[in-house]
Amino acid sequence: MSSISRDEVAHLARLSRLSLTDDELDEFADQIDGIIEHVQKVSNVDTEGVEPMSHPSDLAGVMREDEVHPTLTAEQALDQAPASQRDRFEVPRILGE
């Protein structure tokens, strides 16, 4: 069974722009090894004669006609908002200019 090395985890962290401590590198290497082990177990399951499926249930999508129901007006929806502008919620900027 192949296992992922600490150096490979460090390489993945660099590619992902993550800064990991030595303890985190060891911990993640162990976790990834566990994941790989589980995937290998699933890969070894005998699926001979099992038809491929996209969903474990035979349920089909149930369609219905859209029904219009009363909704809040913009004024009602914004009534308790801390800030609004032009009938929209105003929120603090989280991304740069």
UniProtKB/Swiss-Prot annotation:
InterPro entries to which the protein is assigned, alphabetical: Asp/Glu-ADT_sf_sub_c, GatC
Keyword match Membrane: no
GO biological process terms held by the UniProt record: glutaminyl-tRNAGln biosynthesis via transamidation; regulation of translational fidelity; translation
Broad class of enzyme this protein falls into: ligase
Extent of Basic and acidic residues compositional bias: 85-97
E.C. no: 6.3.5.-
Protein biosynthesis found in the keyword field: yes
GO molecular function: asparaginyl-tRNA synthase (glutamine-hydrolyzing) activity; ATP binding; glutaminyl-tRNA synthase (glutamine-hydrolyzing) activity
Region (Disordered): 74-97
Gene3D superfamilies, alphabetized: Glu-tRNAGln amidotransferase C subunit, N-terminal domain
Pfam families reported for this sequence: GatC (PF02686)
Keywords: ATP-binding, Ligase, Nucleotide-binding, Protein biosynthesis
Catalysed reaction equations from the record: L-glutamyl-tRNA(Gln) + L-glutamine + ATP + H2O = L-glutaminyl-tRNA(Gln) + L-glutamate + ADP + phosphate + H(+); L-aspartyl-tRNA(Asn) + L-glutamine + ATP + H2O = L-asparaginyl-tRNA(Asn) + L-glutamate + ADP + phosphate + 2 H(+)
Self-association state and partner proteins as the record states: Heterotrimer of A, B and C subunits.
Membership in a protein family: Belongs to the GatC family.
Name of this protein: Aspartyl/glutamyl-tRNA(Asn/Gln) amidotransferase subunit C
Native species: Corynebacterium kroppenstedtii (strain DSM 44385 / JCM 11950 / CIP 105744 / CCUG 35717)
Lineage of origin: Bacteria, Bacillati, Actinomycetota, Actinomycetes, Mycobacteriales
Name of encoding gene: gatC
